[in-house]
Each structure stands twice: as C-alpha cells, then as structure tokens.
C-alpha cells in the first residue's frame, strides 16, 4: 500500500510553510510505516508450496501405483495460517498424512499432522482428498511452539515433505518434497 500526497506548492504562503513541512513529514512517516509492515507480512507472498507424491520418493522406495499431490497456500497478510489440499488416487487403507521435517532421501520427525483416518470406516476407498487450514497450534515435533512462518521457512529451505501412510505401508506409501512455486 502506497500513500500519495499531492501538494500544490505554487499557492502556498510563508504562513503555510510549517503546515507543508508537517504534511510532508506525516506522509513520509506513513510510507515508512506501511513499507515496514508490508515487507514482513508478504515474506511469503506469491509463494504456494507444492509436492508431487509417489512411492519412489519414500525412503526406502515403495512399489505402488498410488500417486498424489499437495498444495499449501499461506494466507496473507499475516502468514499465520496456511490453507492446504492433499489428493491421492490409487491408494487404499489410508491411515494418516503428515508434513515431516526432512531433506530429500532422509526420513524425519512429524512436524504437522494433516489428518488421521480409520480405514475400516471406508473399506472400498481408492483415493482420498482432504483440505483444511493450519495454524501454529497444529505444529508439533521440531516445530512445536513455533509460528507458521517457521514452517514456511522450512518448506522454502527444502527441508519438509508430505507423506501419506497406509495399513500396508505404515511408514508411508507415497511421499513428496515440498517446494515453492516461485
């Protein structure tokens, strides 16, 4: 947000010079304050984070036909919430999905539980779609007690992944590293 003040100096008198100075000072102060707020609140502006989920990304790799994707969208201006959508097809007996802390090729601790599911409630399941909103209260493990901005920083640093767990593969059937779309 930029605030513009237009002043016609041609018609100003000496008496109004102090008013001109005050107006300019207030305008500059407003621009500086708004710029400071905007730079912190838009740290992740235009950054959606995505993951393509496959069995080959699991550690060790899992032989499965299941695939999926996940998208995480920071909600501006505060970046203290993240909307997400996780889809998977060709997958059965899903028990949970998480964001884990971990670099590619390594397993890591759970940072966020996206959902848990009782597969006996839907035995004919052949896919899953889940969406929701994350806040700081959802953070656990290495991110417990931290802010959503810490999760976003970890995602941006390529040190988080999404995986979906099943009865057949309790450590994860499909996985994908989260990365920025920018």
Model segments located where?
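Secretory targeting signatures
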Residues: 1-45
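Metal-centered catalytic cores of metalloenzymes
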Residues: 20, 34, 40-97, 101-182
